[in-house]
């Protein structure tokens, strides 16, 4: 059943401090927009986030595609922008290995993701050990709480993440009510009857385009929110060729928020 509670109501009862913070932020800023900023230079990355920051609750990064990445030059300014504009950070790492390996991938290497990213995500392909490994890395790397999303469904054409795979991934998510805060999915993932309040974040959302020729399939803001999405993830729709990030950021922010108000009966 699609949740119709407000973000504030959900924050008050959520077991995860990360989810609580995110829900409160969304309500305060009146936005459920996550900007997916996939660009190859630190300068463009930070410039886009500066423009989009006022309109988003989250920025989604693929930090490993930035050619000139450095912790001091890329992450430190990103954290400053997050503080300035009051948004959280989601590194779209899609971990998919055994627990011991992902623990090292999350905490170490060049990127040290657990030190700076509020939220990350993982596939369920290797079982529940991946949740345990990532949680241990989070606890050992940062005093700040961290949250994990499981990849239950994908927006790409021909995706294998459906049916039994999705159901098994949901079962893995149930292994840690505090650390696993929700899913990357196309619809509500249930769990309410068992006391879970999962956040659903949905990529492949567009107000104009239907696809990109490389397998991405777009759905409208109203379509995804009506079927259970809490946060809309938008990338090229915000800053693709010929688009003004400030104009599009406001446009998608307003569309997402109005869809949320309709769903909760507030509009």
Curated annotation (Swiss-Prot):
Stored CDD domains: OMP_decarboxylase_like
Species: Debaryomyces hansenii (strain ATCC 36239 / CBS 767 / BCRC 21394 / JCM 1990 / NBRC 0083 / IGC 2968) (Yeast)
Gene Ontology BP, a term: 'de novo' UMP biosynthetic process
Similarity-based family: Belongs to the OMP decarboxylase family.
Active-site residues (renumbered): 94
Record-listed E.C. numbers: 4.1.1.23
Protein name: Orotidine 5'-phosphate decarboxylase
SMART domains associated with the record: OMPdecase (SM00934)
Pathway note: Pyrimidine metabolism; UMP biosynthesis via de novo pathway; UMP from orotate: step 2/2
GO CC aspect terms: cytosol
NCBIfam families reported in the protein's UniProt record: pyrF (TIGR01740)
Residues annotated as binding substrate: 38, 60-62, 92-101, 218, 236
Molecular function via GO: orotidine-5'-phosphate decarboxylase activity
Annotated InterPro entries: Aldolase_TIM (IPR013785), OMPdecase (IPR014732), OMPdecase_AS (IPR018089), OMPdeCOase_dom (IPR001754), RibuloseP-bd_barrel (IPR011060)
Reaction(s) catalysed (UniProt annotation): orotidine 5'-phosphate + H(+) = UMP + CO2
């Amino acid at each position: 059943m699609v949740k119709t509670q407000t973000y504030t109501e959900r924050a008050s009862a959520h077991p995860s401090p990360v989810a609580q913070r995110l829900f409160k932020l969304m309500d305060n800023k009146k936005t459920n927009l996550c900007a997916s900023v996939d660009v190859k230079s630190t300068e463009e990355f930070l410039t886009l986030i500066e423009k989009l920051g006022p309109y988003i609750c989250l920025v989604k990064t693929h930090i490993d595609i930035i050619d000139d990445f450095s912790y001091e030059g890329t992450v430190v300014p990103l954290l400053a922008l997050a503080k300035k504009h009051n948004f959280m950070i989601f590194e779209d790492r899609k971990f998919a290995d055994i627990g011991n390996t992902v623990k090292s991938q999350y905490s170490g290497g060049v990127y040290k993701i657990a030190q700076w990213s509020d939220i990350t995500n993982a596939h369920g392909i290797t079982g529940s050990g991946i949740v345990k490994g990532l949680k241990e890395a989070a606890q050992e790397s940062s005093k700040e709480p961290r949250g994990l999303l499981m990849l239950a469904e994908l927006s790409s054409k021909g995706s294998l993440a459906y049916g039994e795979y999705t159901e098994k991934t949901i079962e893995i998510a149930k292994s840690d009510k505090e650390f696993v805060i929700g899913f990357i999915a196309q619809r509500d993932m249930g769990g309410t009857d068992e006391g879970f309040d999962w956040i659903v974040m949905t990529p492949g959302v567009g107000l104009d385009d239907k696809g990109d020729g490389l397998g991405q399939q777009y759905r409208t803001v109203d379509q995804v929110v009506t079927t259970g999405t809490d946060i809309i993830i938008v990338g090229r729709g915000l800053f693709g060729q010929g688009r003004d990030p400030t104009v599009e950021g406001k446009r998608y922010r307003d569309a997402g928020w109005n869809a949320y108000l309709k769903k909760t009966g507030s509009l």
